[in-house]
C-alpha cells in the first residue's frame, strides 16, 4: 500500500511540474524541466505499484482460497458440535426479553412441524448447491467414486464405512452437491441418516433437513422406503458411535459383525444394499483412545448407551496454522467409493437365517470393495480391513 501511495504522490508531483512548464512557456520562458514528469511519476510507475500491491501476501489468491476452505470446514464443525445447543440457549434468552414473541412463534411452528424430519424433511437444492460446500470439498479434498449404475425403480440402503469422528465424507458427498452426487446417480435421492436427537434442536434441525438429512429411526426409514416412491437411497453410517471410538489415523476397522438391523430393514422393504468405503475418513482427526476397562471408556459407553453418542477427545489443526491444535480437521484426501448393489428380496417377516445370510453377503462385498480399491488410494497390498 505504501508503494501505491508513493507512486500516486509521484504522479501528482509530475503533474504539478508539467503544469509549471506549460505556464512558463506561455510567458515566453523555457520549460523548467522537460524530464520532470518522467522523473517524478509516469503511467509505468502506477503499473509497477499495482504489481507490487497485488503481490503482497494477504492478497495472494491461493492463500485466500485456502483460508476460505478452512472457514467453510470450521463452520460445519462448529454447527455439528454446538449449533443446536447454542440456538436453544439463544431462543430461551429471547423468550425472557421484550422479543419473546419471536421465540413463541418459533416454538409454535416447531410443534406443528415436529414430524417433518420423519418424512424426509425439506430438502433445499439451493442450500445443497451453496458455494461454501465446494470450498469444503476442496479443503481435503473429497472425491465420490461411482463403480456401478443404480436403477431409479429400486430403493437402496447405503452402508457407509467407517464413521470417523464426524463422518465428513458422508456429509459432503450425500448432503451437498459438491461432488455432484445427483449427476453421478441421476434419479436417486440421497438421505443421510443421523441421530434423531439432532432434530429436537431448534434451527439445527432446519439446517440439517435442508441438506436432505433425516433421523436414523425405524419410522423414518419405513416411511422413505414404502411411502416415498422409488429412487430413494438412505445412507446409514452403520458403525455409529461405537466405531467412532476407535477412529484414528492409519487404522482401517469397521464395527459391523453384530450390526444387522439395517439388513432386516432392507429385507422388509426389498431395498438393495450398497456397501460404501471412504478411504481417508479416519485420517482427518487424531483421538485419545481409552483402553477397554478404563474410566474414560466407561464414561464413553454410558453416554453411548443413554444418549446415543460417545464423546471423543480429539483434535485437528488450528484455524491459522497447521502446526497448532484446534477443531479444524487435517487436510487429508477422503475418497468415498460406492460399491455394487446387492439385490435384496422383499420379505415381510424375514427369519434370522435370512438376515444372517444377507448380512454375510454384505460383509463379504464390503471387504471385496476395500481390497479392490485400497492400493489406488495409498494403502499397501497387505493392508487388511478389520471387521469387528
UniProtKB/Swiss-Prot annotation:
<comment type="function">
    <text>Essential acyltransferase that catalyzes the terminal and only committed step in triacylglycerol synthesis by using diacylglycerol and fatty acyl CoA as substrates. Required for synthesis and storage of intracellular triglycerides. Probably plays a central role in cytosolic lipid accumulation. In liver, is primarily responsible for incorporating endogenously synthesized fatty acids into triglycerides. Also functions as an acyl-CoA retinol acyltransferase (ARAT). Also able to use 1-monoalkylglycerol (1-MAkG) as an acyl acceptor for the synthesis of monoalkyl-monoacylglycerol (MAMAG).</text>
</comment>
<feature type="transmembrane region" description="Helical">
    <location>
        <begin position="70"/>
        <end position="88"/>
    </location>
</feature>
<dbReference type="Pfam" id="PF03982">
    <property type="entry name" value="DAGAT"/>
</dbReference>
<keyword id="KW-0551">Lipid droplet</keyword>
<dbReference type="GO" id="GO:0006651">
    <property type="term" value="P:diacylglycerol biosynthetic process"/>
</dbReference>
<comment type="pathway">
    <text>Glycerolipid metabolism; triacylglycerol biosynthesis.</text>
</comment>
<dbReference type="GO" id="GO:0048471">
    <property type="term" value="C:perinuclear region of cytoplasm"/>
</dbReference>
<dbReference type="InterPro" id="IPR007130">
    <property type="entry name" value="DAGAT"/>
</dbReference>
<dbReference type="GO" id="GO:0006071">
    <property type="term" value="P:glycerol metabolic process"/>
</dbReference>
<keyword id="KW-0812">Transmembrane</keyword>
<dbReference type="GO" id="GO:0035336">
    <property type="term" value="P:long-chain fatty-acyl-CoA metabolic process"/>
</dbReference>
<dbReference type="GO" id="GO:0042803">
    <property type="term" value="F:protein homodimerization activity"/>
</dbReference>
<keyword id="KW-0443">Lipid metabolism</keyword>
<dbReference type="GO" id="GO:0035356">
    <property type="term" value="P:intracellular triglyceride homeostasis"/>
</dbReference>
<dbReference type="GO" id="GO:0055089">
    <property type="term" value="P:fatty acid homeostasis"/>
</dbReference>
<dbReference type="GO" id="GO:0043231">
    <property type="term" value="C:intracellular membrane-bounded organelle"/>
</dbReference>
<dbReference type="GO" id="GO:0007584">
    <property type="term" value="P:response to nutrient"/>
</dbReference>
<keyword id="KW-0256">Endoplasmic reticulum</keyword>
<comment type="similarity">
    <text>Belongs to the diacylglycerol acyltransferase family.</text>
</comment>
<dbReference type="GO" id="GO:0050746">
    <property type="term" value="P:regulation of lipoprotein metabolic process"/>
</dbReference>
<dbReference type="GO" id="GO:0010867">
    <property type="term" value="P:positive regulation of triglyceride biosynthetic process"/>
</dbReference>
<dbReference type="GO" id="GO:0016020">
    <property type="term" value="C:membrane"/>
</dbReference>
<dbReference type="GO" id="GO:0005829">
    <property type="term" value="C:cytosol"/>
</dbReference>
<dbReference type="GO" id="GO:0019915">
    <property type="term" value="P:lipid storage"/>
</dbReference>
<dbReference type="GO" id="GO:0042632">
    <property type="term" value="P:cholesterol homeostasis"/>
</dbReference>
<dbReference type="GO" id="GO:0060613">
    <property type="term" value="P:fat pad development"/>
</dbReference>
<feature type="region of interest" description="Disordered">
    <location>
        <begin position="16"/>
        <end position="40"/>
    </location>
</feature>
<dbReference type="GO" id="GO:0006640">
    <property type="term" value="P:monoacylglycerol biosynthetic process"/>
</dbReference>
<dbReference type="GO" id="GO:0005783">
    <property type="term" value="C:endoplasmic reticulum"/>
</dbReference>
<dbReference type="GO" id="GO:0019432">
    <property type="term" value="P:triglyceride biosynthetic process"/>
</dbReference>
<dbReference type="GO" id="GO:0034383">
    <property type="term" value="P:low-density lipoprotein particle clearance"/>
</dbReference>
<dbReference type="GO" id="GO:0097006">
    <property type="term" value="P:regulation of plasma lipoprotein particle levels"/>
</dbReference>
<dbReference type="GO" id="GO:0003846">
    <property type="term" value="F:2-acylglycerol O-acyltransferase activity"/>
</dbReference>
<dbReference type="GO" id="GO:0050252">
    <property type="term" value="F:retinol O-fatty-acyltransferase activity"/>
</dbReference>
<feature type="topological domain" description="Cytoplasmic">
    <location>
        <begin position="1"/>
        <end position="69"/>
    </location>
</feature>
<dbReference type="GO" id="GO:0004144">
    <property type="term" value="F:diacylglycerol O-acyltransferase activity"/>
</dbReference>
<dbReference type="GO" id="GO:0046339">
    <property type="term" value="P:diacylglycerol metabolic process"/>
</dbReference>
<keyword id="KW-0012">Acyltransferase</keyword>
<keyword id="KW-0808">Transferase</keyword>
<feature type="transmembrane region" description="Helical">
    <location>
        <begin position="93"/>
        <end position="112"/>
    </location>
</feature>
<dbReference type="GO" id="GO:0005789">
    <property type="term" value="C:endoplasmic reticulum membrane"/>
</dbReference>
<dbReference type="GO" id="GO:0005739">
    <property type="term" value="C:mitochondrion"/>
</dbReference>
Amino acid at each position: 500500500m505504501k508503494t501505491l501511495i508513493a507512486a500516486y504522490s509521484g504522479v501528482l508531483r509530475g503533474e504539478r511540474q508539467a503544469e509549471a512548464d506549460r505556464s512558463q512557456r506561455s510567458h515566453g520562458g523555457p520549460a523548467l524541466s522537460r524530464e520532470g514528469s518522467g522523473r517524478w511519476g509516469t503511467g509505468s510507475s502506477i503499473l509497477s505499484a499495482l504489481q507490487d500491491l497485488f503481490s503482497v501476501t494477504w492478497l495472494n489468491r491461493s492463500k485466500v482460497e485456502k483460508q476460505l476452505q478452512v472457514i467453510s470446514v470450521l463452520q460445519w464443525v462448529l454447527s455439528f458440535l454446538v449449533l443446536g445447543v447454542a440456538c436453544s440457549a439463544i431462543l430461551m434468552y429471547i423468550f425472557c426479553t421484550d422479543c419473546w414473541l419471536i421465540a413463541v412463534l418459533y416454538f409454535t411452528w416447531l410443534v406443528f412441524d415436529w414430524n417433518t424430519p420423519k418424512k424426509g424433511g425439506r430438502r433445499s437444492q439451493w442450500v445443497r448447491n451453496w458455494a461454501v460446500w465446494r470450498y469444503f470439498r476442496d479443503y481435503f479434498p473429497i472425491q465420490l467414486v461411482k463403480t456401478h449404475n443404480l436403477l431409479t425403480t429400486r430403493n437402496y440402503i447405503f452402508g457407509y464405512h467407517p464413521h470417523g469422528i464426524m463422518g465428513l465424507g458422508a456429509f459432503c458427498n450425500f448432503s451437498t452437491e459438491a461432488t455432484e452426487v445427483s449427476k453421478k446417480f441421476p434419479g436417486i435421492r440421497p438421505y443421510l441418516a443421523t441421530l434423531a436427537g439432532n432434530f429436537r434442536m431448534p434451527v439445527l434441525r432446519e439446517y440439517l433437513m435442508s441438506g436432505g438429512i433425516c433421523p436414523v429411526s425405524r419410522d423414518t426409514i419405513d416411511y422413505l422406503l414404502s411411502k416415498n416412491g422409488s429412487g430413494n437411497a438412505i445412507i446409514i453410517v452403520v458403525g455409529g458411535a461405537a466405531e467412532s471410538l476407535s477412529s484414528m489415523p492409519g487404522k482401517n476397522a469397521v464395527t459391523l459383525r453384530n450390526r444387522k438391523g439395517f439388513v432386516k430393514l432392507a429385507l422388509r422393504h426389498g431395498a438393495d444394499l450398497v456397501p460404501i468405503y471412504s478411504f481417508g475418513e479416519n485420517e482427518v482427526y487424531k483421538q485419545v483412545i481409552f483402553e477397554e476397562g478404563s474410566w474414560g471408556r466407561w464414561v464413553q459407553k454410558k453416554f453411548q448407551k443413554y444418549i446415543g453418542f460417545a464423546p471423543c477427545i480429539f483434535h485437528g489443526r488450528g484455524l491459522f496454522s497447521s502446526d497448532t491444535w484446534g477443531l479444524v480437521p487435517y487436510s487429508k484426501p477422503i475418497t468415498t467409493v460406492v460399491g455394487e448393489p446387492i439385490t435384496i428380496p422383499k420379505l415381510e417377516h424375514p427369519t434370522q437365517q435370512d438376515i444372517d445370510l444377507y448380512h454375510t453377503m454384505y460383509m463379504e462385498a464390503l471387504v471385496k470393495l476395500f481390497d479392490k480399491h485400497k492400493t489406488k488410494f495409498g494403502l499397501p497390498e497387505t493392508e487388511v480391513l478389520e471387521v469387528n
